[in-house]
Amino acid sequence: MRILVNGAGVAGLTVAWQLYRHGFRVTLAERAGTVGAGASGFAGGMLAPWCERESAEEPVLTLGRLAADWWEAALPGHVHRRGTLVVAGGRDTGELDRFSRRTSGWEWLDEVAIAALEPDLAGRFRRALFFRQEAHLDPRQALAALAAGLEDARMRLTLGVVGESDVDHDRVVDCTGAAQIGRLPGLRGVRGEMLCVETTEVSLSRPVRLLHPRHPIYIVPRDKNRFMVGATMIESDDGGPITARSLMELLNAAYAMHPAFGEARVTETGAGVRPAYPDNLPRVTQEGRTLHVNGLYRHGFLLAPAMAGEVARRLLTEQGQPERRAS
């Protein structure tokens, strides 16, 4: 079966990879000149289903807990399994108790244990929650590696094109995300803003979430002394540059985590529109010969593998073939 996948963000790339591994003939098309040009490129890359359960429905945990294994199988060496640390400032320590009641899979840490995990946070927080089973990856590196793997496998990847003709394909899988807002019923945009900083004065080994009643943030370590700080959530489909207010909120929160971030160089700011359905859960829907994969909201890297698996199951069932294990 010949499949056209439109959109080379995290949804399109994972779908293309999964279908290729199942033996489908896949063409991947992307309007932009690069992969991950939309919201996927501004993601944190946290594979954190237990933490996300704090404000998400149960499927985020049940589907998302398989994501780290999927990414490790597809891209060996790209997944960092170091857990997630969740902290709160002195006046906000009650947020930790609230967070613990709404999640599972954590263990309490005292000051000594925090310092053992993250020496640069020694003495800054009295207690923390540690989600040992969680992981993270660098989104842009992962997307580029997935695209390179598909090209090495001689799968057709076309970038910077308006759109491939679907006439020569048996099925189309649309993974164009926010481009479908206003077209797919119930799909809306949620704006997310982030920034990247660079400093040699702070070292972190894992994502750290700083809880706050109004402005919770996370900081994800990257390579070369870089950190991604995110992310706002605004009910809007405005994809324009980051606002001054959001920039100040993110920088102030990073400074509250460690004052050395006040001297960090801001190397990038960005904003993306995350497509979401009313329940904030992704869906695979069908419209004629087209399957739509959309609504990944803030869970792109966490839930895209599960959505790719669902697409593969549907197409294999249509062909009358049993699903075989694919990475």
Swiss-Prot record:
SUPFAM superfamilies: FAD-linked reductases, C-terminal domain, Nucleotide-binding domain. It comes from the Bacteria. Keywords: Oxidoreductase, Plasmid, Thiamine biosynthesis. Pfam families: DAO. One of its GO terms (molecular function) is oxidoreductase activity. Gene3D superfamilies: D-Amino Acid Oxidase, subunit A, domain 2, FAD/NAD(P)-binding domain. Pathway: Cofactor biosynthesis; thiamine diphosphate biosynthesis. GO terms for cellular component: cytoplasm. GO terms for biological process: thiamine biosynthetic process; thiamine diphosphate biosynthetic process. May have amino acid oxidase activity in the biosynthesis of thiazole when cysteine gives its thiol group to be inserted into the thiazole molecule and the rest of the molecule is deaminated to give pyruvic acid and ammonia. NCBIfam families: thiamin_ThiO (TIGR02352). This is Putative thiamine biosynthesis oxidoreductase ThiO. The gene is thiO.
